[in-house]
Amino acid sequence: MTDFVNCYENATRAEAYAKLEFANTYHLAFRDLPEILHTHVNGSAALDFGCGTGRSTRLLRQLGFEVAGVDISAEMIARARAIDPQGDYRLIPDDDMSALPRAGFSLIQSAFTFDNIPGAETKIRLFRSLRELLRPDGILVNTVSTPEIYVNEWASFSTEDFPENQNAKPGDPVKIITTDFEDRSPAADILWPHASYLEVYDRSGLEVLEVRKPLARGDEPYPWISETRIAPWVIYVLRPQK
């Protein structure tokens, strides 16, 4: 996967992400996950694609799934194994998922992974590979950033140093700083709006079952900035096309 620029493949970023929890803006990305999985998923075999340091993998296990986490970053996988020695964390080279069981998973979760993957063709290739890993009744939950996250301020993020984000077009790079940890080096993501994702899903042989854009309710113990008015995340619930 020669055009995959992974800005998270370094020890400093892995160490920073290992300290993240489900607080502040990140709370909204996972708050509704138990309900979504209860509604749509039958079975317990799960894959966490782009697991990073294992935060989302451990959540799935807490929710009762038998889960394997995979990532292309050796630093992230090393950190996940250090935090959770009993967990199943696997390093995959680029987008080679041939070692994973075909039609072996009732659930595949991908949290924020596709924010950093450029180009429709690369996204489609990955989604097709993930589709082949799903059981016929399996579900793929893809959580990604909304375009609005890159032009507003948040409890967990800042974009005020990057006014060029305002003029970004679909497929352009955008920058964002995570304020929940000390490493303030910006992440370089790819702007990919809703219509572009719908096209990618269709070409990948995936059907959209549900779309959620979670907002903060205002009664949570977090210092919301934009979260009660603007959704930072969009959660796509997908299944193989019939």
Residue ranges of each PLM-predicted region?
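Conserved class I S-adenosyl-L-methionine
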Residues: 1-41, 55, 59
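Class I SAM-dependent methyltransferase SAM/SAH-binding core
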Residues: 47-49, 53-97
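A short acidic, Gly/Pro-enriched loop at the edge of an enzyme's catalytic core
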Residues: 99-108
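A short beta-strand submotif of the Rossmann-like class I SAM-dependent methyltransferase core
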Residues: 110-113
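A short His-aromatic
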Residues: 115-119
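A short glycine-rich, Lys/Arg-flanked "PGG" loop and its adjoining helix->strand segment in the class I
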Residues: 124-136
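SAM-dependent methyltransferase
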Residues: 141-202
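C-terminal lobe and adjacent flexible extensions of AdoMet/dcAdoMet transferase-like proteins
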Residues: 204-242
